[in-house]
């Protein structure tokens, strides 16, 4: 990419070297515009333009990121780790802010580039899945005593399953696209699990599940893997860091990581929860947590997997009923296919729940 005046103006606002030699698009993310900067010193940085249409409160978001990364740096230093590789490091502007606002009102930020490490979009083998589990567990461990209530809720009610259920019922009632009659079976699947939707929210309200710092996008591609050792070194993409439940972060990883089928698989006979991969993740996650979670949190990990899968399927069905406005679709009925896949996974997990609990008990005793 040509280093135009706009890029020069933006980078000059940050505390960086003088001679920028290259600016190229970087990574496979779909939300923010991301570039890798190279300076004549050989040092690299990541420059990002934040997507305000998705993250409508960029200042609050950056306050979350700043607070969490500063905390992580302190913990990593105390543990004798490498702060430049084991957490994201924000570069401040010359005004002392973690972001710069350009003439068009766009928000930009700069991170140190983590050298000799890679993000993978797909799980190559179970070791990758295990490493991501260790990393997200370790993330919980390092942030266990962070005051989660001080974080901004940048996406309100993101994993409030009761709120999602209310929105679903409204979509069924309004039936703006006249699709409800064709999906009565799927609608009934949700209504039959009204009590399920309340389980984790009720436990949080009753103080049985503590508020934690949660990542809310616990995919493999948000983990940096060291090129030399193959070990996970850093959790990235902290834009959705918010107060939440640890079991939800765990559950979302299982939802897509331990499924035997693609998220939009039409042949539902191919869709189930792979208990071997589930066990791989449980082992890594509990190891990474290092005793940071409560007994109740550990006991509810299987329920987190079921509920996150149920919530996701319900969101796909809600979007289908409302006319496919939220999730991008690539064919007719795409959201319905996604919904059916998630519901098949829920049913399979419900049937395997006792085994899923046994696996957690096996590793929480270690």
Locations of the language-model features?
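Conserved ATP-binding subdomain of kinase catalytic cores across diverse folds
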Residues: 23-170, 244-246, 257, 262-271, ...
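Secondary-structure capping and boundary motifs in well-ordered enzyme cores
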Residues: 103, 210-215, 242, 277, ...
């Amino acid at each position: 990419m040509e280093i135009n005046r706009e890029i020069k103006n933006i980078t000059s606002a940050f505390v960086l070297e003088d001679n920028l030699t290259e600016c190229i698009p970087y990574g496979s993310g779909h939300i923010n515009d991301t570039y890798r900067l190279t300076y004549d010193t050989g040092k690299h940085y990541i420059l990002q333009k934040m997507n305000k249409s998705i993250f409508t409160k960029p200042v609050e978001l950056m306050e979350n990121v700043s607070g969490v990364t500063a905390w992580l740096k302190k913990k990593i230093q105390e543990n004798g780790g490498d702060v430049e590789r084991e957490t994201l490091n924000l570069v401040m502007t010359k005004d002392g802010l973690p972001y710069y606002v350009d003439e068009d009102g766009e928000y930009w930020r700069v991170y140190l580039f983590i050298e000799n490490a890679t993000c993978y979009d797909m799980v190559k083998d179970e070791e990758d899945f295990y490493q991501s589990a260790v990393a997200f567990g370790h993330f919980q461990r390092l942030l266990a005593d962070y005051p989660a209530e001080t974080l901004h809720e940048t996406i309100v009610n993101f994993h409030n399953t009761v709120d999602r259920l209310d929105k679903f019922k409204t979509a069924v009632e309004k039936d703006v696209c006249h699709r409800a009659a064709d999906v009565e079976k799927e609608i009934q699947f949700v209504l039959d699990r009204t009590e399920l939707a309340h389980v984790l929210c009720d436990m949080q309200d009753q103080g049985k599940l503590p508020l934690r710092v949660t990542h809310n996008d616990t995919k493999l591609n948000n983990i940096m893997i060291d090129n030399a050792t193959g070990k996970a070194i850093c959790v990235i993409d902290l834009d959705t860091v918010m107060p939440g439940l640890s079991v939800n972060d765990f559950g979302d990883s299982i939802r897509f990581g331990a499924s035997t089928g693609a998220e939009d698989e039409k042949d539902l006979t191919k869709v189930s929860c792979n208990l071997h991969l589930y066990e791989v993740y449980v082992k890594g996650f509990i190891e990474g947590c290092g005793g940071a979670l409560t007994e109740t949190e550990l006991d509810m990990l299987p329920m987190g997997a079921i509920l996150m899968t149920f919530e996701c399927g319900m969101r796909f069905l809600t979007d289908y009923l409302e006319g496919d406005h939220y999730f991008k679709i690539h064919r007719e009925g795409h959201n319905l296919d996604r919904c059916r896949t998630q519901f098949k996974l829920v049913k399979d997990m419900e049937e395997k729940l006792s085994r899923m609990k046994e696996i957690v008990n096996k590793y929480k005793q270690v």
